[in-house]
Regions:
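TPR/TPR-like (Sel1-like) alpha-helical repeat modules
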Residues: 81-102, 108-118, 125-129
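Helix-start (N-cap) detector for alpha-helical repeat units in TPR-like alpha-solenoids
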Residues: 32-34, 67-68, 101
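Canonical tetratricopeptide repeat
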Residues: 3-4, 38, 72, 109
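Structural marker of alpha-solenoid helical repeat scaffolds
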Residues: 28-29, 62, 96
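Canonical positions in the second alpha-helix
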Residues: 24-25, 58-59, 93
């Protein structure tokens, strides 16, 4: 009700009244992810991306199964120098909102980001999912060391590869999951735990093709056609085993501190 009423005020140009309605709603429903989303959207429309992220990430923590806050936060980080948070939020979004048009769009975006942030030259592979410069934080220092831990594991994972396509990206992520689990125990999170479950069930390769499939549909179709039994087995398991995120295991920048 508060979301609809606030949206109605926003549509007739009364953005201040809309914000007031959303804030009133949060006083009564403090875990309403949809209201955090709307407050974030209001900030985003005004170009205030730092405070938009504040609301989106508060929404993620308050209502961790509500997908849209992950989606909006991911898009902001994709346009920043801290893409690491974008790829984490983007993948979690896809797990929560499967098979929608936004999910397909996120698949393409994730593949694009991985392709841009992993590069190959004469001296080997380069990984650049984050920058020492903080773009969207009020802190004078980086909020936590998760990005460095992510990059370290990714650098180890890309060794030996010369190109990036779906097949090599799967191999990289297989090695990354092992490396991250072994050396970044303090940053274990709901997504890395889900990866370990997929690996244990033998479905991680198929999952990676599902995750990035819309980034290269031809390559995906070729793999699926050659691995139909493996693909069908993954889909059956995937349907019965959705990710479960709650306040005790929710992933955000600030739960990684």
């Amino acid at each position: 009700v508060y979301q609809l009423l606030g949206n109605a005020y926003d549509e007739i140009g009364q953005s201040g009244k809309a914000v007031s309605i959303y804030e009133q709603g949060l006083k009564k429903f403090e875990n309403a992810g949809c209201l955090y989303l709307e407050l974030g959207n209001m900030k985003y429309q005004n170009g205030d991306y730092k405070n938009a992220l504040y609301y989106y990430e508060k929404g993620i923590e308050a209502d961790p199964m509500f997908a849209s806050n992950y989606y909006r936060a991911a898009l902001i980080f994709f346009a920043s120098t801290e893409e690491v948070w974008g790829v984490m939020y983007g993948e979690l979004f896809m797990l929560l909102e499967r098979d929608s048009e936004r999910c397909k769009s996120m698949s393409r975006e994730l593949y694009k980001i991985y392709s841009e942030e992993i590069s190959f030259g004469r001296s080997g592979a380069e990984v650049d999912f984050d920058s020492p410069t903080i773009v969207y934080s009020n802190s004078s220092v980086r909020p936590n060391l998760f990005p460095e831990s992510f990059r370290s594991a990714m650098r180890a994972a890309v060794r030996g590869e010369r190109i990036l396509d779906l097949a090599s990206l799967n191999r990289i992520r297989q090695r990354f999951a092992k490396e991250f689990s072994a050396n970044s125990s303090s940053f274990e999170n709901v997504l890395s735990a889900y990866h370990q479950e997929l690996i244990a069930q033998g479905h991680f390769e198929a999952y990676n093709y599902w995750l990035f499939g819309y980034g290269d549909p031809k390559q995906t179709a070729s793999w699926v056609n050659a691995n139909k039994t493996k693909w069908d087995s993954f889909l059956a398991w995937f349907e019965k085993n959705p990710i479960s995120i709650n306040p005790s295991n929710v992933f955000s920048r600030y739960t990684m501190e």
